[in-house]
């Protein structure tokens, strides 16, 4: 799946006429249907400068149908945190989380829990034991996901190496629910309502009713693209409304750590990679739920796929 994206971005390079590029992408998307290694592929949508230049569904799927975008939803939770900060509901990335979640802290908590910040959760540098991969099932089988996550032993110092954990984003969802006074889904639908074409469908909740930050969110490829377009425009909608603060988009795309699996940088809910001569920022979800944004030179176009 990664090679598919690299091929797409290469075709979307800025070396030939836009019309020729558009035709190349359409041809490529058609050819993907016959590739055995891409049989799980459901849909691909590619846009350039806000215009969809090619889209295709495979094996009966369509770009308008919802699917579980998995961890790509972490980028959406990051946007909600940025909006909450802009609204004064949160102080900023350096705000400590312990006072916000004091009811769920362990009775004999490691003192380092008082050092974890909002930014640490966003960049996967909380230091707490990971609740992803082989530990995920044990976590979501617990009676209280927030308390279970906060009770994990520290594997590193807060602000240390990247420890990718869906629990970190879930703690952000719990914090948003508390400071926003509404469920995270209600906040998302209210705050991101101005984004044309964006819609969250079903979304799993924990036993306390908190929406699962960072997983189990249903969305269509077109809707995910609409979110990508919002970030392409530095948080501004097509009609000029500033939904996500522009400086938050820049902060989110600034690498703070790196994946030990790929070496790609990681900011606030977004991965970063250099492909060819382009900086690429992407939301990643298990099973190939991907949103890529390629940022060229200032006088070039901007692709989202």
Name each model-derived stretch.
Residues 50, 67-93, 121, 172-176, ...:
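Active-site SXXK
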Residues 168-175, 215-236, 289-305:
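Active-site-proximal alpha-helical segments within enzyme catalytic domains
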Residues 32-61, 291-292, 300-302:
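A short, well-structured edge-of-sheet supersecondary motif
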Residues 2-13:
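Bacterial N-terminal signal peptides
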Residues 18-20:
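Boundary at the C-terminal end of the N-terminal hydrophobic targeting segment
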Residues 63, 132-216:
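Catalytic-site signature segments of enzymes, centered on catalytic residues
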Residues 246, 250-303:
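Active-site Gly/Thr loop motif
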Residues 87-126, 151, 180-215, 219:
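Active-site helix/loop module of the DD-peptidase/beta-lactamase fold
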């Amino acid at each position: 799946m990664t090679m598919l994206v690299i091929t797409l971005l290469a075709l979307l390079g800025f070396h030939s006429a836009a019309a020729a590029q558009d035709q190349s992408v359409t041809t490529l998307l058609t050819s993907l249907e016959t590739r055995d290694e891409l049989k799980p592929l459901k849909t691909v949508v590619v846009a350039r400068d806000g215009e969809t230049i090619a889209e295709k569904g495979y094996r009966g799927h369509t770009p308008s149908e919802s699917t579980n975008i998995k961890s790509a939803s972490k980028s959406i939770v990051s946007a909600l945190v940025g909006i909450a900060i802009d609204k004064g509901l949160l102080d900023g990335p350096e705000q400590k989380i312990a006072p916000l979640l004091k009811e769920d802290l362990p009775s004999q908590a490691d003192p380092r829990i008082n050092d974890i910040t909002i930014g640490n959760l966003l960049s996967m540098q909380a230091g707490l034991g990971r609740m992803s991969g082989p530990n995920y099932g044990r976590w979501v089988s617990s009676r209280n996901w927030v308390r279970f996550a906060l009770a994990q032993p520290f594997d590193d110092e807060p602000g240390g190496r990247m420890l990718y954990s869906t629990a970190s984003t879930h703690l952000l969802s719990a914090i948003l629910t508390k400071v926003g006074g509404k469920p995270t889904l209600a906040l998302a639908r209210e705050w991101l309502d101005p984004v044309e074409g964006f819609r969250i469908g079903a979304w799993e909740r924990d036993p306390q009713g908190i929406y699962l930050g960072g997983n189990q969110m249903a969305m269509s490829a077109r809707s995910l693209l609409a979110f990508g377009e919002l970030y392409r425009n530095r948080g501004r909608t097509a009609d000029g409304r500033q939904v996500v603060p522009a400086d938050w988009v820049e902060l989110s795309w600034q690498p703070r750590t790196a994946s030990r699996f790929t070496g790609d940088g990681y900011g606030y809910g977004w991965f970063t990679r250099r492909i060819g001569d382009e900086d690429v920022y992407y939301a990643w979800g298990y099973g190939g739920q991907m949103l890529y944004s390629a940022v060229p030179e200032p006088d070039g176009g901007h692709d989202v796929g």
